[in-house]
Amino acid sequence: MAVIKMKPTSPGRRGVVKISRDHLYKGEPFAPLLEPQFQHAGRNNNGHITTRHKGGGHKHHYRVVDFLRTKDGIPAKVERIEYDPNRSAHIALVCYADGERRYIIAPRGLEVGASIMSGAEAPIRVGNTLPIRNIPVGSIVHCIELQIGKGAQIVRSAGTSATLLAREGIYAQVRMRSGEVRKIHIECRATLGQVANEEHSLRRLGKAGAKRWKGIRPTVRGVVMNPVDHPHGGGEGKTGEGRHPVDPWGNLTKGYRTRNNKRTQVMIVSRRKK
C-alpha cells in the first residue's frame, strides 16, 4: 500500500496524508452480513454522557465480523478485501466450501483467491486459525482469544501482532505489541500473521472537519472551563491547573496507573513498557 501526500491546494489539504485503497474492493459490502448501527453520541440509556468527545459522523452499517472462526476443517476462499468504516483494519470476505460467506479480519499478505482454514488440523499458514497449543513457538499471531470459545478480543487493530514466546503447562506466554507478556490458555485460538493496513498510523486527517466525519467531537482543555465543569477550571485570565493534573472527576492523570482488575492480574507476567 502506498502513502499519498496531498498537494497543498488549501489549508485543509496541506497536511493530509492518505493511505491508498487501490487494492480494495470497489463495490458494495455483502448485504447479508450488514446490520444497522444506531448513533448514541456517547450517551447511555439515561441520556448521560459516558464516553466524551463522541457525536455526529457519517452513517454506516456494521459489518458482522467472524471472531470465533469455528467452522473447523472446512476450507474457505478469499473473495475480496474490503474497507471497514468501523475499524482500522481491513476485512476479507471469505466463502466456505459449503457456500457460507463470512467476514474476517484481513491479515497482511492475504490475497484474493487464497485459501484459509480453521481448526486444530489447519496448516501453519497466514490467515489460518488454530488453538495456541498447535501454533509453533515464535510465531506471529493476531486476533487472540482471552477466554476459550469467546472469540478474538485482543490484537485486532491495523498493523498489530503478538509473538508466541513459550508454552508451560496449560498456559502459553504471548508478548503484546506494548511489551506486555501475558499468559493465555493453550486452548484459546489465535490467527497466524499480522493484521493488514500497517500504514494506518501514518495517515493524517489534516483538518478538524475530517475528525467530525469520523464522529469525533472536540476535546476541550480543562483549564479553559469553569470550576463547575472541571477541577482545572476558573481563575482570572490565563492560569494553570494549580494542582497535579487530573481528569474531570478528580483522578490523577499523566502517568498515574489506574488499572484495578485483580481477577486477571495473575495472568500478566510482565507489565507493558511506558
From Swiss-Prot:
GO terms for molecular function: rRNA binding; structural constituent of ribosome; transferase activity. InterPro entries: NA-bd_OB-fold, Rib_uL2_dom2, Ribosomal_uL2, Ribosomal_uL2_bac/org-type, Ribosomal_uL2_C, Ribosomal_uL2_CS, Ribosomal_uL2_dom3, Ribosomal_uL2_RNA-bd_dom. GO terms for biological process: cytoplasmic translation. It holds the Pfam family Ribosomal_L2. One of the primary rRNA binding proteins. Required for association of the 30S and 50S subunits to form the 70S ribosome, for tRNA binding and peptide bond formation. It has been suggested to have peptidyltransferase activity; this is somewhat controversial. Makes several contacts with the 16S rRNA in the 70S ribosome. Part of the 50S ribosomal subunit. Forms a bridge to the 30S subunit in the 70S ribosome. NCBIfam families: rplB_bact. This is Large ribosomal subunit protein uL2. It comes from Albidiferax ferrireducens (strain ATCC BAA-621 / DSM 15236 / T118).
